[in-house]
Amino acid sequence: MLDVNFFDELRIGLATADDIRQWSHGEVKKPETINYRTLKPEKDGLFCEKIFGPTRDWECYCGKYKRVRFKGIICERCGVEVTRAKVRRERMGHIELAAPVTHIWYFKGVPSRLGYLLDLAPKDLEKVIYFAAYMITFVDEERRTRDLPSLEAHVSVERQQIEQRRDSDLEARAKKLETDLAELEAEGAKADVRRKVREGAEREMKQLRDRAQREIDRLDEVWNRFKNLKVQDLEGDELLYRELRDRFGTYFDGSMGAAALQKRLESFDLDEEAERLREIIRTGKGQKKTRALKRLKVVSAFLQTSNSPKGMVLDCVPVIPPDLRPMVQLDGGRFATSDLNDLYRRVINRNNRLKRLLDLGAPEIIVNNEKRMLQEAVDALFDNGRRGRPVTGPGNRPLKSLSDMLKGKQGRFRQNLLGKRVDYSARSVIVVGPQLKLHQCGLPKAMALELFKPFVMKRLVDLNHAQNIKSAKRMVERGRTVVYDVLEEVIAEHPVLLNRAPTLHRLGIQAFEPQLVEGKAIQIHPLVCTAFNADFDGDQMAVHLPLSAEAQAEARILMLSSNNILKPADGRPVTMPTQDMVLGLFFLTTDSEGRSPKGEGRAFGSSAEAIMAFDAGDLTLQAKIDIRFPVGTIPPRGFEPPAREEGEPEWQQGDTFTLKTTLGRALFNELLPEDYPFVDYEVGKKQLSEIVNDLAERYPKVIVAATLDNLKAAGFFWATRSGVTVAISDIVVPDAKKEIVKGYEGQDEKVQKQYERGLITKEERTQELIAIWTKATNEVAEAMNDNFPKTNPVSMMVNSGARGNMMQMRQIAGMRGLVSNAKNETIPRPIKASFREGLSVLEYFISTHGARKGLADTALRTADSGYLTRRLVDVSQDVIIREEDCGTERGLKLPIATRDADGTLRKAEDVETSVYARMLAEDVVIDGKVIAPANVDLGDVLIDALVAHGVEEVKTRSILTCESQVGTCAMCYGRSLATGKLVDIGEAVGIIAAQSIGEPGTQLTMRTFHTGGVAGDDITQGLPRVVELFEARTPKGVAPISEASGRVRIEETEKTKKIVVTPDDGSDETAFPISKRARLLVGEGDHVEVGQKLTVGATNPHDVLRILGQRAVQVHLVGEVQKVYNSQGVSIHDKHIEIIIRQMLRRVTIIESGDAELLPGELVERTKFETENRRVVQEGGHPASGRPQLMGITKASLATESWLSAASFQETTRVLTDAAINAKSDSLIGLKENVIIGKLIPAGTGLSRYRNIRVEPTEEAKAAMYSAVGYDDIDYSPFGTGSGQAVPLEDYDYGPYNQ
């Protein structure tokens, strides 16, 4: 068996009949499957043991040889080889067909590859294949030309004979008529009778003439057909063809069905055809040229590969191994079988019947019918339903063919190769574990025992608690007490992976150190819930166990939750205290403000002294007091040092100081690192996130993790002691509400009257009412706000950011206000009641309308968002960091600061998502002094420093300007947002980009909504807009952009309206037809620049690329995608969007091929285009010219170089057909390809540069060790394999929060 890790490419091609016979272990001759009495496979049938191998290990069919000692022997009685039964998953058979059949993929696919090769329309091809027309396969041109005069003479003689026969027959009939008439006259017959006789005679004579004419016409038709007969002509008229064959059968050959195509393909000259097509491309135009290009693609595919076109017509059909199409017995004695067996049986039955008919010498019409049925049976086996009605099984269900086994979500690629189920896994409900440290999880004992069973058993044997593995297993099953002691020892520092579906980004799987817990639920640390998007309302999570030392090391170093504090989408912390914790810390840091609590104004010598007073009940947490802080404490930012007295030294950073603060804040600061500036303000959710952000940016991960744990513990501790609860009495409806509502009701009536009088339109009335009631709602909300004391629990929850917002509070205590209907239009009738007062029936009904739409929307959004993520992953999966630095000097100029109206510099709003975490492309120099050198990471600290120096824009490295041949380089990517350090080589940044864009997809709205004033002015927003951008579709209601700079003229007629631009350079005017309702951005006589938008709306990215070039379309797409995410408050870094856009623009359309081996109109990878042109220029030829092509992500995924990746994405059969014809080779660069064939993925530690590394100490390391300790006891041989042990994080002990 091939070792999967030691080959570089995987090629697919067309299998010829010889290949199929070579793979086969024998011919399947009978349609039988198994004997229903003995339940053993039938000989020569579809499950035959002689062909496919034994059904039992080391046992032949007849039972003569049993046991492994006869390995390899072929039984002389039954012919079965003695071997393992698993060969029945590998061995193939074949069916020898009595007549050739075409492969449906190549004739019925779009475009039809067979049709393109032979230059036949698919309709005509179908006629030949299904025996509705004859095809001429050979014409003896030379002999025909030589014999033409004599044949023509022969035909003219025959024509004369027909005419002579006609004339003599007519003459005889005329004489008979004369005789008859004479006789009648003699008898004295009436004129009437004579007339009838004459008419009858004339009728017969006409028939004679017509028959003769038909014969002559037929003869002429046959002769003309023969004269102009060419190879590949079709003849659908059976009688005409027979006559042709009878008369001139020695000059040509013709036949029906796949046999005709087979003969044609054998004599087909590929080189000659290619030359002819190239000539047409050089000289032809329009449709003819386009068709020639498409045909040349197919012809050159066969020329440039070892494929033979004969492979498209099959003489034998492979039979896949029986264990891949199993037959199993059900309880009632019946059998369930794979559909493939039924399809194979149909093929074998028809094939055997055809053989019998051929042996009997049956008439041609019967044989042809049987051949057609065989063709249809093979079609159904390969791709059921592709042509005609599908073959159905019981209950009219279409049978699953070989193609269906590969296609779609349930197909082989996505079900079994990309999504396998794994062992050493478990699943259970999750509950919160507030006592856990950030890197721990609680694992139920029963689950841990089952997962770690092999480890426990081995350890029991090692410790002599059990004699052997068997007895150890018995001990585990009986649950002896010693087993749990050993389990405790085994799981220590052995990380497990926890995964919550749906895994939308990399933080959906994290590693934790397990702690044994009672019960059956997994315990989760509260801070990782955000990353998993988990809550405890019945969510379940899966546990996976990393087994090898390498897997454990990766889990601990890369995946441990305390190492995954940052979110890969924007590089900001994701493990943020929420809900109760925020409430507790907010309670801790609020001050008395206006109240005089116990202990207010006292002074204390230290925090400990103040705590003592608090414990004694003499002081509250919120009382403002003076506390003296010890040496080393950093005062708050903006701290003013105390005025010094005469002779005293000046106060310096680190000295003791006294501060007016609260005990709560002093306790809060003890949770933070010692050298963190003192926090002397109320800490709500927003302030807390700023603090955690700051910590993540400035401190090592270990300190951040410990601080987060401290914040969690203190948050829960003080939330419990704060006594914050929710009661109905906490919700107070403002007294002023009635008055306010009454006032606005008057205004409402006034508007209503104006409408009834016809003074305002319906649209205006709606807008006025919405404005009135929005104002009313806001006024009630303000009154409600003033009504809530600061200490009100509901108010505290909202103000701290723990839960809820002002809008929800307004609906509970103020008034519900205006709601929207299912079309997302605001209903102008407000809901005047609040939930506290209770809604009337009508009000309740109105409010349910929009709410139901919201729920339906969410369900749809989830599916659409998941599909978007899948397409994004597919298009970007091979973008991996491949090198340190590509050496480019290019970059993007990005703004980092903007000037206010008064001229002061402020940090630009989008710095967080654009400049942050990139590398500088060049030195930042001010007055000849380098402030920041090139290739340095732009973190928060450096950006602040640059803004302070007055720098407004910087040139940064970017993925879009990276020049790496494969993947991208670390310097152009910059900082890895998930780790906060420069990205490592091997990081799969493409997939991270796709996850970062796809994960918040569910939060985006689905709406295409109507903007209030303008009817029909639809704006696509939310998820559909993101999809539209990434699929590079022309937007709905596209806004034209000017193709040249010039003057604007607006022309308007009764029905149409257009903007005409007269270019400055005097070239032709350009007219842009627009709708009468479009809102203009330019006026009559304005001057526009090239690429300027002329109306309101979205621009077409293809136009931007064509008119303004590649850089402009990149900026446009990044900006538009960010606009959608920003509108929902989602933060995603530009670099993720840039990766996707780079993949969309990585292909070039060839315009002129020059001397390069490229076809005009062909789409090629940019790198291939540049490499080929370089080669041509070096050889002194003309390079090819091309233009950049913007492709949508679906199209870009299917156009990838890797056929494995494309086939597993969409349109599986089309991709495989194409790949097989082109004999494509997959160089296994991306991730999907390697997952499919079971190789290590070429990312992270799977990169070849990281495998088989020997670690040796450097000279410096040795010297340092020598100086540190006695060198006799150190072994400097190369390090061996790791033990899999790791350093516990508990080395950093911060103790309880309040010591």
Curated annotation (Swiss-Prot):
Amino-acid positions noted as binding Zn(2+) 1 in the UniProt annotation, renumbered to this chain: 60, 62, 75, 78
UniProt-annotated binding residues for Zn(2+) 2: 886, 962, 969, 972
UniProt EC number: 2.7.7.6
GO cellular component, one term: DNA-directed RNA polymerase complex
Chain residue ranges for the region called Disordered: 385-405
Keyword entries, A-Z: DNA-directed RNA polymerase, Magnesium, Metal-binding, Nucleotidyltransferase, Transcription, Transferase, Zinc
Catalytic reaction equation(s): RNA(n) + a ribonucleoside 5'-triphosphate = RNA(n+1) + diphosphate
Function: DNA-dependent RNA polymerase catalyzes the transcription of DNA into RNA using the four ribonucleoside triphosphates as substrates.
Family as reported in the entry's similarity comment: Belongs to the RNA polymerase beta' chain family.
Official protein name in the record: DNA-directed RNA polymerase subunit beta'
Gene symbol of the encoding locus: rpoC
